[in-house]
Amino acid sequence: MTTEIMQISLSHNPADARWGEKALISTNDQGVTIHLTSHDQLGGIQRAARKIDGQGIKQVKLAGEGWGLEQSWAFWQGFRGPKGQRSVVWAELPANEKTELEQRLKIIDWVRDTINAPAEDLGPEQLAKNAIDLLCAVSCDAVSYRITKGEDLREQNYAGIYTVGRGSDRAPVLLALDYNPTGNPDAPVMACLVGKGITFDSGGYSLKQSAFMDSMKSDMGGAATLTGALALAAARGLKERVKLYLCCADNMVSGNAFKLGDIIRYRNGKTVEIMNTDAEGRLVLADGLIDASEQNAPLIIDAATLTGAAKTALGNDYHALFSFDDELAQALLNSAHSEHELFWRLPLAEFHRSQLPSNFAELNNVAGGAYSAGASTAAAFLSHFVKNYQQGWLHIDCSATYRKSAVDQWSAGATGLGVRTVANLLLAQAKQ
């Protein structure tokens, strides 16, 4: 691996034919040139950065014209990897763009590092504390919080988080964080964010195969994404009150783990029969959504690596979006477009809410055998815990959070996708 700094420049001209038809990069004695000849120029820069990293080049300088904020960020998204050190000498940017780049590097890299962390190093309580540390590093004066853990969850009737997490030696945790930059303790809450923080998911007694378990350190991706989104919105100047709920637990097998046929009784009166212990994310989110609904905020967003069905539909390129609120769903899609992130809305209809039949409880935690729209029925399950589910609620199934192996645009591991979109939406809602 070379230790010299490699100069990287941009060109809108095609590479010399000797580099091959439609070559993305070429080299000369001045360094590496990225040739932007396709309509997706940011994607081209990101793919080129992966190629450069793959050649063992770890120290670079972005030189010449064309390196704006988005071009610089696209390069870093592709250049960054989960192991080894990399350094970039950034091109000169206007002060506001430089600040934005620095905030993204701090916050979105935190999200990626947190999701990539081994489960052994990141339990439920550590995830909650790390989230607090990030938000305090951005705007500590505006942050207050409460951590509820272990038996206290049972005593306070957080039945979902407690039930899922009780099978682990590491106690389950609910983080309730209040971002209130107004200084007024009676200020209305503009938005509530509810994140799934399963720090390892074995599947419980509905045990996963190794091929499906090996990436389950990333099952807290929703919690990390929403933490990063709130931090980035705060860094961008969010002046409205937002509450963050992280529902954190391990889903493990033990003599104390929950079992098929168990019934969970939630604080809102709903009862849920467990027919699959590997459908645990919705069980912990339900507690957070009940709390969020009690705030009467006009906006509730939950995010979770919830279903394999969403990945089957969209792969790892798009996050799946569900909502009964067409206007709000479009607002998020507009934010995603502004931030160059990919979201796709999947169906969620009133009839999905009745596709969770149980013989012994009001709801089943998985859909009946006749209903195969797994991502939609998972979203429908969550809607039963949102007081006004038809308006002001968005569910994000984080299918683009993590990649088990590298592709031409991304290294293996976490992507950080979704952070910018949710931050953008929070700021847009604050202006209304």
From Swiss-Prot:
* One Pfam family linked to the record: Peptidase_M17
Question: PROSITE patterns from the entry?
Answer: CYTOSOL_AP
- Report the EC number(s), separated by commas if there are several: 3.4.11.23
User: What is the name listed in the Swiss-Prot or TrEMBL entry for this protein?
Assistant: Peptidase B
Q: What class of enzyme is it?
A: hydrolase
Listed binding positions for Mn(2+) 1 are D201, D278, E280
Q: Can you say where in the cell this protein is located?
A: Cytoplasm
Q: Which organism is it from?
A: Yersinia pestis
Source domain of life: Bacteria
Matching InterPro entries? Leucine_aapep/pepB, M17_PepB-like_N, Pept_M17_PepB, Peptidase_M17_C
- Cofactor binding mode, per the note? Binds 2 manganese ions per subunit.
Q: Which GO terms describe its molecular function?
A: manganese ion binding; metalloaminopeptidase activity; peptidase activity
Q: Which GO terms describe its biological process?
A: proteolysis
Q: Which cofactor does it need?
A: Mn(2+)
Where Mn(2+) 2 binds, per the record, is at: K196, D201, D219, E280
- Role this protein plays: Probably plays an important role in intracellular peptide degradation.
What does the annotation say about its assembly with partners?
Answer: Homohexamer.
What does it catalyze?
Release of an N-terminal amino acid, Xaa, from a peptide or arylamide. Xaa is preferably Glu or Asp but may be other amino acids, including Leu, Met, His, Cys and Gln
